[in-house]
């Protein structure tokens, strides 16, 4: 009361860290949503993206399902995102999937697009590796080898040893 503003600092309430975890999760989900948008907005990039990203890299169940269906369509040469909407019967899921397909990526130059796409690929791989590490059985040597390969690939991408060969023309 009378002490406030008298030069005595007010006690600071410690932060719980809950919001930071949620923000991190939101960032990973945004990366997955952006990747789906890239894949449907620029189908000509699909082959290059598929070298680094697979449906297993989508850790949010809804996005994993959508990615799996998109990859199947791509493999048959019939990429049609609108057809996927019929698969989802829940209104909320339909809205979320439609939002992914109708999103815009507000980047001006090809250089900005390439950097953004590389950032999304790296972020998704990081999340995927963390997710798979957390659920890996201690005796799964083959899974461990795949994780190590994924980590090496991610390090190479970040270091510029591997390149996304993409063009937005």
What are these regions (language model features)?
Residues 1-169:
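A charged alpha-helical hairpin associated with nucleic-acid processing machineries
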